[in-house]
Structures are given as structure tokens and as C-alpha cells.
Regions:
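Domain-terminus/edge residues, biased toward the C-terminal soluble/receptor-binding domains
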Residues: 65-69, 77-82, 86-167
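Active-site-adjacent loops and short helices of periplasmic peptidoglycan-processing enzymes
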Residues: 1-86, 96
């Protein structure tokens, strides 16, 4: 959509009117933090980003997110859009357990789409032994955040850090 194509912030550089594999969009969201990819997926799943946010809120309640409110698919600033560190950890655990087929994407170091290669923004992947995912985020208001995961032996560790001045 034109809305996805014009979206500011991080992008995977989806071209207006192009056809894209769902797998590429998912990788664009996970690896590149592509706001454009988020919107394309939201519109495909629910018809509009607003309807997708409603789906996120309903699903969040169902899986035990008690202090989160979604207003968009990207995390773009909105006074009512919020998520606690605890809810982020619950969501991370559910993604890992419910969608294991997508978890390897969180450990990919880079993704190339439309002849543009972008590195994964997760700094712990290259620095922490056993680190294997998850996701970074940033807004001017909230600062930098990270949901990091690592596996040591049989133990999975999920770490949530929010409000950092730098990553």
C-alpha cells in the first residue's frame, strides 16, 4: 500500500505495487525492523493496520499480556501504545514456543532484499555466547530496547531491557 511505502523509520524498502513473499516480509520485520513490512503484513492479515492492532490487543489478552495496548503494527509512537517489560518477555516466550519455524530468523546476521543488504540490529548476537535472538526497537520517546535470548545447555534465557540511551 502507499501507506506502507511512505512509512518513516526503519525500512526493508518495499516498492509500491510490488509482490513480496510472506517469508521475505517476516524476515524484513525481524531482521531489518522494516516498518513498511509490518504495515504490508498487517493490511494483508486484517485489512487495515487499525484492525490489525485490534487483533493484537485481543490476542495479547488471550496469551496473558496484561499491561499492553497496541495502536499500530510498527511500534510507532502513540500515547496509547504501550508494552511492559514483563509482557515483552511473555510474548517472546510464546513466539519461541508457538512459532519455532520462525525463530531461526531472529539469529540471521543480515537480510538482502531488493539489492539492499541490512545487518541485524541485535548487538548481542555477535557478542554473547549462546545468544540466538530476538528483537531490538527504538523510538525517540522510549529510547532503545532489546529482547534478547540465549540458550545454554537446556536452559533458555529471555532478557528485556528498555529505555537505553544507545544500543
Amino acid at each position: 500500500s502507499e501507506r506502507a511505502w511512505r512509512m518513516a523509520g526503519s525500512k526493508m524498502f518495499v516498492e509500491l505495487g510490488s509482490q513480496i513473499k510472506v517469508e521475505d516480509l517476516i524476515r524484513g520485520v525481524i531482521i531489518q525492523s522494516g516498518n513498511d513490512a509490518c504495515i504490508v503484513l498487517a493490511e494483508a492479515i486484517s485489512g487495515s493496520e487499525q484492525q490489525f492492532a485490534e487483533l493484537l490487543n485481543d490476542t495479547g489478552k488471550r496469551i496473558g499480556l496484561t499491561n499492553s495496548t497496541f495502536r499500530n503494527s510498527t511500534g510507532w509512537p502513540d500515547p496509547e501504545h504501550k508494552m511492559t517489560a514483563r509482557d515483552l518477555s511473555i510474548l517472546a516466550r510464546r513466539i519461541i514456543s508457538d512459532f519455532p519455524e520462525y525463530f531461526p530468523y531472529y539469529n540471521e546476521r543480515s537480510f538482502r532484499y531488493n539489492n539492499i543488504s541490512q545487518d541485524n540490529r541485535n548487538p548481542i548476537l555477535a557478542r554473547v555466547p549462546g545468544a540466538d535472538g530476538m528483537k531490538t526497537g527504538h523510538t525517540e520517546d522510549a529510547g532503545y530496547g532489546l529482547v534478547g535470548t540465549a540458550k545454554r545447555g537446556d536452559r533458555r534465557v529471555i532478557m528485556v531491557v528498555n529505555g537505553l540511551p544507545t544500543m
